[in-house]
Amino acid sequence: MAVFPLSAKHRKYALRALAVSIILVSAAYIASTEGTERVRPQRVEQKLPPLSWGGSGVQTAYWVQEAVQPGDSLADVLARSGMARDEIARITEKYGGEADLRHLRADQSVHVLVGGDGSAREVQFFTDEDGERNLVALEKKGGIWRRSASDADMKVLPTLRSVVVKTSARGSLARAEVPVEIRESLSGIFAGRFSLDGLKEGDAVRLLYDSLYFHGQQVAAGDILAAEVVKGGTTHQAFYYRSDKEGGGGGNYYDEDGRVLQEKGGFNIEPLVYTRISSPFGYRMHPILHTWRLHTGIDYAAPQGTPVRASADGVITFKGRKGGYGNAVMIRHANGVETLYAHLSAFSQAQGNVRGGEVIGFVGSTGRSTGPHLHYEARINGQPVNPVSVALPTPELTQADKAAFAAQKQKADALLARLRGIPVTVSQSD
């Protein structure tokens, strides 16, 4: 369980103060450890009783974060977080029959906002459906729990992270609380140059990425805007850029000189000939349901029966019916990337090993779908990442794009410069 203090009135200023304080603490730590003998820490584990909020003595609101264990119900997680039984009963009695509150994904987090009086005020978590992750936000007003989410409540803030690798890059990033989707996206961005798992002790990672906040609580991560990896003394940089002509399709990653960063492991083929991108990867407010959703892939609008092609060489690992995805094909490629092609009307005869460009199925509207389209996903270690960063061709920058890219890159690089020379830092920039 993790507890995060929060001052709602001064949250914006608190974030700035947090950035400064952590930088100062990092600098103080470096100064204090020079010329002293390092003491080996001892790990002590002790099972503690469940947290009781009532006598905490905390006078301001704070967030409690609890991880979902296999087989947990929402009531189980809320009880473990310390919420009073009568509050849990009110929530389960009102919302216990709703599907998105019955099915929780193991290892996801449930966040509870606790007021200064020790009572629960809000509950937030994401459900995990095929192709979408939906924000469930419960808020207590006038003693009554209600579902709540709106554009006005959602804020996107750029986040800076700087990490020095100790034993492993993934472990060091996780300990610095870099979200798993950012860790896997980073792995894919530089896959053409090096493996993230190949970083050694003393190597460094500096990141600038978008974070999504709901009522002041970070609930999700967006795109990596810039990344800098120092590997064996050599610095590798990547900058996100989206031109106007790409519209809703998302951007791509280029090095500091505006060159295509990598060949993406042979992903040089679009999965189909399409008319438009009807829904890009990322978070959006559902226009009808008025809930925040992460769309875990890219939707391509195309006529029924349009051939769908493997986007790179690989091995078909699944072909059949897959829940809300309808008829789907999954292909495992090099560098740990897996692609998924959903809502197909029919399959081709392809099986086993396939070549990039080989037809694997045909556009349809099976599963949870409102019309013919292809839902295309890219995953690394099972984690959905933006396909444009790892599993779609990267266009060369035009002369007009190069000027715009240079200006955008200069701003991002100035933010990364704040992190150079600091071992570990966590900060916000707005």
Curated annotation (Swiss-Prot):
Peptidoglycan (PG) degradation activity is completely inhibited by zinc chelating EDTA and phenanthroline. Its EC number is 3.4.17.-, 3.4.24.-. Zn(2+) binds at H295, D299, H375. One of its GO terms (biological process) is cell wall organization. Induction: Expression is up-regulated in response to transient exposure to H(2)O(2). Disruption phenotype: Altered colony morphology, but not cell morphology. Decreased type IV pili expression. Deficiency in natural transformation. No sensitivity to cell wall targeting antibiotics. Susceptibility to killing by human polymorphonuclear leukocytes (PMNs). Increased sensitivity to PMN-produced cationic antimicrobial peptide LL-37. Increased sensitivity to reactive oxygen species (ROS), however, the survival of the bacterial cells is not rescued in PMNs defective in producing ROS. Survives as wild-type in PMNs deficient in production of reactive nitrogen species (RNS). Binds 1 zinc ion per subunit. Keywords: Cell outer membrane, Cell wall biogenesis/degradation, Fimbrium biogenesis, Hydrolase, Membrane, Metal-binding, Metalloprotease, Protease, Zinc, Zymogen. It holds the Pfam family NMB0315_dom_I. GO terms for molecular function: metal ion binding; metalloendopeptidase activity. Its cofactor is Zn(2+). One of its GO terms (cellular component) is cell outer membrane. It is found in: Cell outer membrane. Likely to be synthesized as a proenzyme. The cleavage of the N-terminal domain is probably required for the activation of the enzyme. Changing H373A: No effect on colony morphology nor sensitivity to H(2)O(2), but reduced peptidoglycan (PG) degradation. Altered colony morphology, increased sensitivity to H(2)O(2) and loss of peptidoglycan (PG) degradation. Monomer. Belongs to the peptidase M23B family. Has both endopeptidase and DD-carboxypeptidase activities. Degrades cell wall peptidoglycan (PG) to allow consummate expression of pili. Degrades N.gonorrhoeae and E.coli PG side chains in vitro. Required for proper piliation, which in turn is required for normal colony morphology, resistance to H(2)O(2) damage and defense against killing by human polymorphonuclear leukocytes (PMNs). Involved in type IV pilus biogenesis. Involved in resistance against non-oxidative killing by adherent CXCL8/IL8-primed human PMNs. This is DD-carboxypeptidase/endopeptidase Mpg. It comes from Neisseria gonorrhoeae (strain ATCC 700825 / FA 1090). The lineage of its organism: Bacteria, Pseudomonadati, Pseudomonadota, Betaproteobacteria, Neisseriales.
